[in-house]
C-alpha cells in the first residue's frame, strides 16, 4: 500500500493560559510535487492522492444512489451535507451545472457504478480481495463513493464527512482520490467491565462516535444485566426490550452494530448431560435470540468467561455454536441483514491455545470467532501471541485460526481511581500482520466519554494497522480533538484535555499488566529536582520552574472544567478535574514551602506546607459511585503523586522542627543516584551486619559522599563510619575525609589535612561541635568497585545498660562473593531470607572453607541454630559433609558435631543443637569437610544462650535508689532480676517502668519481708494508686514497691513480674514448607500474596496466629481468579487454643486431582468469582468462604485433605469478617471513640511524622461525634501543647486537659485549653503543674490529626511585658494631632497587640512581631498640617485657569499636580505641613510652566487650492496646439504649489502666512489659466487668422519688454518662443 505520509506540525497556544502541547500531526500525501492543504482523515485511508485542483461545491447538490444503498447510508449523506448547510435533491442521473454526489455499489450496474467504470480507473479485484473496500473520488464537480456493498459505501461517505468538516469558507473542495479498506474485519468495543453500567444514552453516544470512525461492533455484555447472565433463560420484559431496540437501531444507523452477548454458562448453565436437556436449553437460547431479532438486533455472541467448562468437555461448546450457526442461517431468510458471525469467549480466554479446550474449540465452523485476551487477562494485540495461538490451537485437519482479541484496555476495574487516557502502542502493537487478527474489541472504563481516545485508537489501528510507534503517538495526539468536539480543528479545550491526559495514563497495577507511562516529559524534571533537593543545593529556581509546570496543569484542568467542547465528557470526568486542582495546590504548596525554608521564612514554610498537606488530603475526597461503594479520583499516579508524597515526607522533617523546635530528626544523605540494596534504616541501627550497597555505577567518583543531616543542630561529640560491604570490605572509597556543616549548606573539613585511605572503620572523638550534619566524602576516584556503608554512629555511648553485650558479626571464607541476597539476611531471624554465594576455584567450595559468627565476646551457649540452603534459586547449593565447631581465640577450634547430608533434597536444612552443659565460645562456625563443585546458600544463623536471655539491663528499672538492679522486658511481661539484700529507707522505692502505658493483667511479687512496703501503680509517675488485688489492675506504666514506713526495710527480691494483656499482628505459626513472605496472607492487602514453596501432602498444614481472640463470623480464602497454585483439597479451620480445631470451609472432595488439573483456575474448582462478593473481593479474584460462623478464634489453619504434587500453595488473603479493620495493638495510651480508620492509628499522633495521622472511622459519616484521648505517661509538666490537624478539614473540636498539681490531696480536674480552629493550634499552660491527659472532642467534623506535641521546661513562656507597656503607652493617644492614615495604622497595630495580649496562647514570635509593628506605627505617626494660607491662594489660582488657553503637554503636567492639590484639600486632616508646603511649591511651578496655546489657523482653503493646482497640472499638456498650454506654464504653477505646501505642512504656520500662500497660489493659477492656447491666440493683427502679418509684428518687436500684447507666454519679453509659436501655427 502507498503510505507516503508527510506530517505538518502545528502548535496552538491557549488564549487563557499557556499549555505545553504535543504537536498536532496532520496526515498528508504528496503527489506530482504539488503542495496543497490536505485533509486530516481518521481512520487513515490506505491510499490517498491529491491532483492539485479544487472546485466550488454548488449551493444545491444532485445526489445519485445505486440500487442497494440502504437508508442508513443515505442518512449519512444527508448528515454530511446538512452540516455544511448544503441543499440537495436526489435524481437518477448526473446533472450538469451542479455538484453531483454519487454513492454506489461495485458491479451493481447503476449510474454510479458506470461512472466509476468510465472515469475512475480501478481493478475489480480490489473489491473482491479487500474488506469493506471503497473508493472515494472528488474531481471535476463530482464527489463519488463506490463500495463493495452498502456498508463499504457508508465508510466512504464517512471519509467525506471528515473532509466536509474541514471545508473552508466558500465550500471549496480539493480534488483527491482515496482507495480504502479495512485490515481487520471486526472492530469495536465490549461493555464487559465490572463497574457501573453505562446508561443507554452513554451506549448510544459511543456507538455514534465509533460509527464516525468506522467501528462496526458494540458488544452488549454488562455485568449488571440479569437477562444477559443470571437470568439468561428468561425473556426480556417489554420495557427492557424497548431500550434494546433503540440501541439496535442506533447500531444499524451508524453501522457500529449492536451485538448482543449471552452468558449461559455461569448461572444454571446450559445442560449437556442428555440430548433432551440440551435441546430444551438450545430452544431457550433461540427463543431469547428470536425476541431480540424482532427488536432489530442483528448480531450475537456467546460468552463463557469466568465460568466452569461443561463437564462433557469443550466439544459441547462446538456443538452449541454449530447448532446456533445453522439456526442463524435459517433466520436470514426473514432478516436479510442478520450477521451469522458468532463471537465466542471460552472459559480459557487467557490461554495460549495449547489447552485441550481451545484445540477442540478450533473445530468450530469458520463463522465462529474465538475470543482471547492476549495470553493473560491484561493482554495485548501481539503478533507473537497470535502466532503461538494459531500454532498451538491447530490439530490435524483443523488449521489454527486467528484470535479475536478482547483487550482489557482502557478498562480500569483494577485501577478504579484512575482514568486510563493512553497506552496506544502498548496494547495495540504496531506492525502486527493483520491476517493474524480476526477482530479486536476493547473493554473500556465505566466513564463512557473518557473512552473515546482509546476508541479512536482502535478505530484507526484496526482499519489500517500502525507501522510504528510514531503513528500510534500521532493518533493519541489527535484523538483529543475528536473526543472533545468531533473535528480536526484544534481548540483550547482539546489542548487542555490533552495536557491533563498526559498525566492520567498509568494503571498503578501489579506485574499482571504492562505499566503505561505517563508524565513522560515531566518525570525527568521531577527526578532531577528530588536529586538536587537531596543534595542540599539551592532549589529555588528549579522549584519555580516546577511551579510553572504545575500551574499550567492546574489551569488546563480548570479551563476544561469551564470550557468543555463536550459537556458530557466534562461531567463524567469532573471528579478528576476537581482532583487536579487540589493535587496541583499540594505540589505547588510543597514547592513554595521548600523555597521558604531555603529563604529562612519559617511562617511561610509552615503555611505553605499546611496548605499543601490539606490540599493533598482534599484531593482524595472526590468520590464517585462504583457499583456498591465509593471510589476516589486520583491523577498523576505514576510520577506526580509520588513526587508530592516524597516532598511531603522530606519537608515534614524540617517543618517538624518548626512546629516542634526541640525535635531532632536524623536523615541519611548521599549524592549517589542509584538505588542501593538494603534499607537506609540500616545505617543507624548500630548493627554492622546490616548495610547499604551501591552497585551501579560500579565506581566511586571524587565528591561522592555518605552522611547524616539533622533537622536541628546537635552537639557532636563523636562520629563513627563503618564502610565497606560485608561481602567485600574493600568496597569502600580510595581516599576520603570527614566534613561537617553548621548551616546545612556549607561543609567544613573536620580534621584539616587528614585523609583516610580505603576507610573501613573510622572513629573521631572528643569533638564538642554544634553541627547540622556530618559526612564522609571521597577525595580520590576509584574504579571497579561497589560502595558499601554499614553504619554511621553519632555520639555512640560505649557504656551499656545490659549485663552482657551481644553484637555478633559474620565470619566466612574471604574468597566467596555474594551473588544474590544480603548477608544481613543471615541474622534477621527469618528463615525465608538468605544469601547465595559464588565460590571460586572453578565454582568449587574447598574443604576447610567456613561460615559462622564472631559473637564479640565469650558467651555461654545453650544451643545453636543454623539453616543451610534456601528455597528458590540455589536451593541445591549446599555442602554434603561439614562440621560444627567453636573457639575462644579464632585459632584453636573444637568440633561439636559432624554432619553428612549427602542425598538430602533441595531446599533448607535446619541444624539445631542443644547443649546440656553450656559451651563457652567467642566464635562458632560450620566448616566444609570435602571439596564440592557448587556455589553455596545459607538462610539463618542464631545462638541460644540463657546467659544472654536472662542477663537483663537497666532500661526498665524504676527506682530512686543507688541499688544495682537489672530488668528484663518483653511485650507482655516486664520484670526485675531477683536480687538479695535490698534495703529501702522511707520514701525509697524499686520497680519497673514499662515501655508505654499497658493494660495490666496481673503482678507476681515475691519478697522475703513486706513490712512497711506498699505496691503501687501509675500511668504517669505522678498519680499513684495502691494495688490491693494483683489480678485486678488499672492501666499503668509504672509499678513500684515503696517504703511508706519510717524505718528502713530489708528484704530479698525473688520475683517482681508485671504482666499485660497484648494483641499482636497476625503471623505464621507453622507451615509444611518455606514461603516467600508469610505476612502477605494476613496484611489486609488483596494485591499481595504469599507462595508456600512446595507441593502439599495429605495432613500438611499452614497455621496462622491471628494475634488476638476474634469473634469470626465470616472467613474467606482469596486468590487471583487466574491463580493455578490454589488449594484444591483442604479444610480451613479455626481454633481458640491452637489444639482443638473446627471446620469453617471445605474445599474439594478430599480426592487427589490429576495432572490435567495443573492449569485449572480456582473457578473451575468450585471457587466463587470476585464479582459475587458484593464488592468485598476484587473482580480479578476468586474465593471460598465460610459464613455465619459465630466462632471465637485465635488461630486459623489450612489442613490439606489430599495431596497435589503438581502445584504449590498461594494465599492472597485469609480475610476475617469481610476485611473488617481490627486493631493489632492494645495501647491504653490512646482511647479512640469510635475506633480509628485502617492506616490512621492513634499512635500516629506521637510518631514525630507529619505525613501520618489519626482519623476516626465515622462509618461514612454515620457517626457524627466522638473523641480521642491521649494519656501522658511521662513529662507531665507540660507548658505548651501543639496540635496539628489537616487544613482541609478544620474540625473546631474542643481540646480538654485533665490537670493537677501532683499533690496527693488535690483532685484532678478537666479544663478546656481551646478549640482546633486552625491547622496549627498552640495552647500554652501557665496555670497547672501537670497535664495528665489531653482529650479532643469533636462534633460533625471528624478531625484528621497529624501530631500532638508537648513541650516542657525547655519551652520558655512568652514574655509580653514590653508589648503591654508599649500598648499602655500608646492606647490613650488622641488622633486629633496626627494624620488620619498614620493614626489608623497605629490603631490597627494597637488592635492586633490587644488581641495578642488577650490570647494566653500567643507565641513569643507573635508577641515580638506585634511589638515591632507597634513601634513602627509609632515612629510613622505624622503631625497634621495647620498652615494652609499659601496653599489656599495657589489652589484658587490653579482652579481658575482654563484648559483651552494652554498647550496640551503643559496642561497635562499641571492637571496632575492640581488634582493632587484638590485631593489634599478634601483630606487636609491626612497631610503633614511638609506635604502641604511641597504641594504649594509643585502647583506654583506647574502654573508657571504652562504654555499659552497658539490660535489654530484654518488651512482648509489652502489645501483645496493646492489640490486644484495639482489637478490642473495633471490634466494639462504644454505645446503649440489649441487646448494646450504655452511651454513653461507648468513650471511656474509647480513652484507656487510647492511653496504653498511648505506653508500647509508647517505645524506652527500663522494665519498671515496661510493667507499670503493662498493669494500667491491663486495668482499662479490665474496666470496658468491665462496661458491656455485658444483659436485666436497669436492673431495679433485681428484678421481672424494666423498669418505672415502676425509673424511680421512679432519680428519687428523682438527684444521688446514693453509690448505685453505680443508676449504669449508672459515671460516679460518678445523672443524666440513667440517666433516659434507663430511659425508652428502658420505651418499647421
Swiss-Prot record:
Residues 781-953 form the F5/8 type C domain. SMART domains: FA58C (SM00231). Residues 1573-1628 form the Dockerin domain. GO terms for biological process: carbohydrate derivative metabolic process; polysaccharide catabolic process. The keyword Signal applies. The keyword Signal applies. InterPro entries: Dockerin_1_rpt, Dockerin_dom, Dockerin_dom_sf, EF_Hand_1_Ca_BS, FA58C, Galactose-bd-like_sf, Glyco_hydro_b, Glycoside_hydrolase_SF. Changing residue 944 to V: In strain: CPN50. Pfam families: Dockerin_1, F5_F8_type_C, FIVAR, Glyco_hydro_20b, NAGidase, NagJ_C. It comes from the Bacteria. Keywords: Glycosidase, Hydrolase, Secreted, Signal, Toxin, Virulence. Its EC number is 3.2.1.35. GO terms for molecular function: hyalurononglucosaminidase activity; toxin activity. Residues 185-466 form the GH84 domain. Changing residue 982 to L: In strain: CPN50. It catalyses: Random hydrolysis of (1->4)-linkages between N-acetyl-beta-D-glucosamine and D-glucuronate residues in hyaluronate. Residues 1-30 form the signal peptide. Changing residue 250 to M: In strain: CPN50. Changing residue 1042 to F: In strain: CPN50. One of its GO terms (cellular component) is extracellular region. SUPFAM superfamilies: (Trans)glycosidases (SSF51445), beta-N-acetylhexosaminidase-like domain (SSF55545), Galactose-binding domain-like (SSF49785), Hyaluronidase post-catalytic domain-like (SSF140657), Type I dockerin domain (SSF63446). Belongs to the glycosyl hydrolase 84 family. Putative virulence factor which is likely to act on connective tissue during gas gangrene. This is Hyaluronoglucosaminidase. It comes from Clostridium perfringens (strain 13 / Type A).
